Design a protein with these regions (language model features):
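Alpha-helical segment of the N-proximal tetratricopeptide repeat
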Residues: 1-27, 33, 37-44
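Helix-start (N-cap) detector for alpha-helical repeat units in TPR-like alpha-solenoids
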Residues: 32-33, 66-67, 100-101, 134-135
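Position-specific recognition of the canonical hydrophobic site in helix A of tetratricopeptide repeat
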Residues: 9, 43, 70, 74-77, ...
Length: 155
């Protein structure tokens, strides 16, 4: 049933997918793969508060779940709660220090806070792990552009 729900979500049949995730969770409330997939589907539907609650439920079951930490972080980032998002990414990095996605996401939040030098460090670290990681490449380029424009304004 979980695979069927995932297929529905992939086909953007979100409401039907949520119904199946709920069926799985009704019989097994601690099924973390279902919680994570449901949270991601709710996030795609724009139901961010429900998604946030679902990620928190997954983290109650497993506080070191990397997918839940990243998902929760991206929701916080979208709400402009960048410091809180960074806490989620830092928690993920404590568990898995060479985690390109967590580094790139942290870089994005740092960039939004105007901490471009720190953001650039995160993007570069992410790219040493995965040189083709699009989010890190785009973030690095944007940070470099912004730093260059700041320097040109000073002179």
């Amino acid at each position: 049933m979980l695979e069927q729900a995932s297929d529905l979500a992939e086909d953007q049949e979100y409401d039907e997918a949520i119904l199946l995730y709920d069926k799985v969770l009704h019989s097994d409330p601690k099924n973390n793969p279902s919680l994570l997939d449901k949270a991601a589907t709710l996030q795609r539907m724009g139901k961010n508060s429900q998604s946030f609650q679902t990620y928190n439920s997954a983290l109650k079951e497993d506080s070191k779940n990397l997918d839940a930490l990243i998902g929760k972080g991206t929701l916080l980032h979208a709400k402009s709660k960048f410091s809180d998002a960074i806490e989620c990414y830092d928690s993920a990095l404590k568990i898995k220090p060479r985690f390109a996605m967590a580094l790139a996401c942290k870089g994005m939040s740092l960039g939004e806070m105007g901490e471009l030098d720190s953001a650039l460090v995160c993007f570069k670290k992410a790219l040493t792990i995965d040189k083709d990681y699009d989010l890190a490449n785009m973030g690095k380029q944007k940070a470099l552009e912004l730093l260059k424009s700041q320097k040109s304004k000073k002179y």
